[in-house]
UniProtKB/Swiss-Prot annotation:
It catalyses: tRNA(Pro) + L-proline + ATP = L-prolyl-tRNA(Pro) + AMP + diphosphate. The keyword Glycosyltransferase does not apply. It comes from the Bacteria. PANTHER family: MITOCHONDRIAL RIBOSOME PROTEIN L39/PROLYL-TRNA LIGASE FAMILY MEMBER, PROLINE--TRNA LIGASE. Its EC number is 6.1.1.15. NCBIfam families: PRK09194.1 (NF006625), proS_fam_II (TIGR00409). It is found in: Cytoplasm. Keywords: Aminoacyl-tRNA synthetase, ATP-binding, Cytoplasm, Ligase, Nucleotide-binding, Protein biosynthesis. This is Proline--tRNA ligase. One of its GO terms (biological process) is prolyl-tRNA aminoacylation. GO terms for molecular function: aminoacyl-tRNA deacylase activity; ATP binding; catalytic activity, acting on a protein; proline-tRNA ligase activity; transferase activity.
Amino acid sequence: MRMNKFYMPTLREDPQDAEIASHKLLLRAGMIRKTAAGLYSYLPLGYRIVRKVENIVREEMDNYGSQEIHMPITQPREIWEESGRWKTFGPEMFKLKDRNNREFCLGPTAEEYFTDLVKGEIKSYKQLPLNIYQIQTKYRDEKRPRFGINRSREFLMQDAYTFDVNEEAMGEAYMNMWRAYEVVFNRLGLEYKIVAGDSGAMGGNSSHEFIALSDVGEGVICYSDDSDFAATDEKAYVYYQVNDENVEKLSSEKVLTPNCKTIEEVSDFLNVDAAHCLKAVDLMVEGKPVIVFIPGDRELNMSKLVSYLKCPEHEIEMMEEQDILALNSSPGFTGPIGLDCRIIIDSRVKQMKNFVVGANEENYHIKNVNYGDDFEGEIVEDLLMVQEGDIDPETKSPLKFKRGIEVGNIFQLGQKYSKSMNATFLDENGKEQFFWMGSYGIGVTRSVSAIVEQNHDDKGMIWPLVVAPYHVIITIVNTKDEEQNTLAEKLYEKLLLQGVEVLLDDRKERVGVKFNDRDLIGIPLRITVGKKAAEDIVEFSERRTLENVEMSSTEAYEKVMEIINSNLKSVGGLYR
């Protein structure tokens, strides 16, 4: 492609609303443009990258036995009512009506669509297993879209679904797709970790997330170097020791604690460690009061609570002051004794002795409280958020923490959707059975963002060869020099004949502008044709190292072909 005709509107400065490197650089390089909050257009360079990621995903899905289909973006309300998710999915779902007042949504995911399709077509165990996928636009009305295409309202995603005869076969399909996803992310050149994840609104019994490591990632993972333990901070079990076995229980006592509303204030005033000052989290769950009590030195893990309550997270809100007063309690002084509402307690509280709780009266707490003697509630094994200093439950070694971007996820759905939507087949005995399902997703456009986050410097992006918009850029230093033009054209045509994807910078621009743009857009292999063109000498460099080496045009051509042939399975076919 000749750049004098190429649509690549680069920017010299970072856009003001861009927060992270990928957002800044993709905008500056003229690869994307913001249309509205969370909505982006992909320009020629950017769209080539998206298509390459998409095609890598497509090839590995095909290699691992998944068949591609294409389904509508618009999904009817009826199938979401069948699954029970029309109301529970939450405000992230875009909803609309047609001219006949029939309700639809813009698909945020596709479990319902795929289940509805298969239940009408697959009737016998002889037609199983089935593995089908699509690469399609998804929509989620994010409350706060940010970070460019990393968290947008409209995004491209691959979603696959497996249908099997039993739980064992579902597990085999799950591991097959696990391996396929590993190959995809390895080919994309991402540094990532696979961690146990929270199933959330998807449901199911088991899930894992593929997290591309990045300091700007919104997700946090924890892992151990001494075992296979790895999980998101939402999923990780907290190994929290309470050493009160030999402590003698004391009699409870109401004490004055003027203006002590926080754990820190109560701990300091009563000279009691923070862990033994019970933290009350005052919530309204589906309109009803629920108080959660946990050790005072920890934070409540909302994902674990949602999993226990089995209700949508958007149905859980913090209590307003009037809600607390209606319970005959006092804001900042809520305690479990005498409360007439649902009480949920982390199991570690049951093991503690002589802790402090709010007295449900302003400026008062009760000390030396003990579970079972003074109050009771629903015990949940683990409601705590993992934090620095926690240890691996298996090896007791300290956990390590890293931030990351979720680029893929896999779920064992079991029979959640087949049962709710009555999707069945006949087994070998002629008996009706529900499908065992798996769900799998790769964020195609989010993967593009993650690749940039892991591959950039202060000059611009550094694309891995496999997803680069072009393999090579040839820069003509002076387009008024006929010998430079001739040599550049010769190299350009020669590489094109081999199926190499080449950008020829033949613009009538200052050479500094050309070099800056070249660094910014991050084409991995670079040939500069300059003042030594008459001697058949060019400069070759790689974007990752920026080291310029003079060589003949033939040597430069051979160098390009050597690198491409060693890095790509094929050129000009698979990745075009």
